[in-house]
Amino acid sequence: MPRNHKEGLALDEKNGNTKYRDAEKLEMYQHAEYSTFKSLGKGSPGPDGDKKIRVHFVYDVKHASCHKVRLVAGGHLTDVPVDSVYSGVVLLRNLCICVFLAELNNLQLHAADVGNAYLEAETKEKVYIIGGPGFGKLEGHTLIIHKALFGLRSSGLRWHERFANTLLTWVLYLPRRILTSGCEGTAIYGSILPRTSTTLQLL
């Protein structure tokens, strides 16, 4: 597995393909779509008070030989933010409990995956980088990081806030019948619905 841009290109050349190069381009295209960076120009100094950090590509091969590259920030170079950096993760045990309760009460389960989830949230950390190899036209540019890039200390928290606020918006503005479809008159309707808004505020 390559450890950096140079090794990725060398491995592509050895294998006679461009899989890692293409994965890098796709990753950078997605950052352009999300407006992750704001360029101050090539060779420009960083903003006063902002911390200069490093970023690097992380390489992986997923199922069906799908090559994936993720741009990760060196968050260890920054000070610990004042606000909490904790963000919970789903435990298999908790997932099993949810499936059990759904089956017990004849409820439908729905699942979704948010691609590039962290990039949906904006970071509050004042950090910038210098675009390196693999950044294309932005190589050598001073780039302010606007989005919750993987590796930043508070990115998990920022995404958690973004997701919770989105769910709360749905609860407040979606028609009530959509939220309670199939549950009217049941114990689930009577016990869960009144607590929905309060629960989401705690997320």
PLM-predicted stretches and their roles:
Residues 162-203:
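Active-site palm subdomain of RNA-directed nucleic acid polymerases
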Residues 1-165, 169-176:
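Chromodomain-type histone methyl-lysine reader module
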